């Protein structure tokens, strides 16, 4: 079921899901892919982005064959939709596939999870070729229309079985993707606060306090290493900074989601992203998840009672070559759809629709 806009309608799983069953992050990790898949089945449906599959340079295919794993390949360049996930699920079932493998960026990671879900919860191995989001790790899929409008999230009651992230591939991606993932990772600390000036153990659940503590640690590492990592990726170098940032963007961001049961680690920043994709679908198309989330987090900082932090945060965004405002991503501030965005944000699950909160927005 797609995620509703009302908190009362969002069905949350009572179980904590702390991460992937197995997580591999190293240079040459594609050579281990076949062995990871063979643990789960002898035939796989591989769903891959065309550019991502090319970026594996034949190593994924060789590893699968060397491990005795047969596979069907679907090169998929489109949005992560319910319709295509159900078609992929039917393909997997009718061809006798026992495991789903996703190779690519966030949309492919989410399509692989949705496919596995509709195929009766087949096992999943994710091969992220981008560190722009934690999609490989998170137990949910962000779903879209074919045109790219957001339909909310499809949530799962289980973790992915394995993640295989080859750092030789990651250090060759455009640094823009790493920067977007950094902003998405930094968002966790900001959005967990959601309307609070600070997070205290006495005021929140131990799960959310744990999520905040981990997110705060990650935030400080981002401040220290983000620029170096992006510089190194631009030069195609695999360094400690790149390894650290990749781990934070994918694994740690995913763990933050898990220890908060998948709700509470995101708020107005991510809701802004969802609403921009919904109301300004065409304008948003050229922009990455973290680029839009970061714009929303400027609002989130003010809503948290820290307007003084907006300027330094925007300065950091500028240093990472991020757009700073909705106008920067081609949205006319005088568009009548802006009122729709505002009202949807005001009536979102992340704030009480009071006069005080309306003034804070």
Regions found by a protein language model. Give the residues of each.
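C-terminal charged capping/lid subdomain of soluble metabolic enzymes
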Residues: 2-10, 198, 306-361
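A short, small-residue-rich loop immediately preceding and capping a beta-strand
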Residues: 92-130
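ATP/NTP phosphate-donor binding region
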Residues: 2-99, 326
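Short glycine/serine/threonine-rich phosphate/pyrophosphate-binding segments
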Residues: 30, 53-57, 107-114, 133-137, ...
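Generic secondary-structure signature for well-ordered alpha-helical cores
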Residues: 38, 65, 69, 93, ...
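A glycine/threonine-rich phosphate-anchoring loop and its flanking beta-alpha core
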Residues: 21, 118-212
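Active-site segments that bind and position negatively charged phosphate/pyrophosphate groups
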Residues: 203-316
């Amino acid at each position: 079921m797609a995620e509703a806009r009302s908190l009362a309608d969002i069905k949350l799983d009572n179980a904590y899901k702390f991460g992937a069953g197995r997580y591999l992050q190293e240079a040459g990790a594609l050579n281990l892919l076949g062995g990871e898949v063979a643990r789960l089945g002898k035939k796989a449906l591989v769903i891959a982005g065309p550019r991502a599959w090319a970026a594996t340079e034949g190593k994924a295919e060789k590893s699968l064959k060397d491990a005795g794993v047969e596979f069907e390949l679907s090169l998929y360049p489109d949005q992560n939709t319910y319709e295509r996930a159900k078609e992929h699920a039917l393909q997997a079932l009718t061809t006798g596939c026992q495991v789903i493998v996703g190779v690519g960026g966030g949309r492919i990671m989410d399509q692989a999870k949705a496919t596995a879900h509709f195929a009766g919860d087949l096992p999943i191995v994710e091969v992220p070729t981008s560190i722009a989001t934690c999609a490989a790790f998170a137990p949910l899929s962000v779903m879209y229309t074919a045109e790219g409008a957001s339909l909310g999230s499809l949530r799962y009651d289980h973790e992915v079985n394995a993640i295989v992230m080859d750092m030789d591939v990651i250090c060759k991606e455009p640094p823009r993707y790493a920067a977007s993932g950094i902003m998405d990772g930094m968002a966790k600390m900001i959005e967990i606060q959601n309307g609070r000036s600070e997070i205290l153990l006495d005021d929140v659940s131990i799960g959310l306090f744990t999520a905040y503590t981990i997110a705060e640690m990650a935030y400080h590492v981002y401040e220290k290493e983000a620029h170096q990592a992006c510089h190194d990726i631009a030069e195609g170098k695999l360094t400690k900074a790149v390894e650290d940032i990749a781990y934070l963007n994918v694994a740690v961001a995913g763990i933050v989601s898990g220890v908060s049961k998948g709700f509470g680690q995101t708020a107005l920043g991510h809701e802004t992203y969802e609403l921009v994709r919904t109301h300004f679908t065409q304008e948003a198309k050229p922009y990455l998840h973290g680029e839009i989330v970061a714009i929303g987090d400027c609002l989130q900082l003010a809503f948290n009672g820290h307007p003084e932090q907006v300027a330094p945060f925007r300065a950091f965004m500028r240093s990472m070559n991020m757009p700073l405002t909705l106008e920067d991503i081609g949205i006319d501030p005088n568009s009548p759809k802006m009122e729709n965005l505002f009202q949807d944000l005001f009536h979102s699950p992340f704030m009480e629709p009071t006069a005080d909160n309306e003034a804070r927005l």
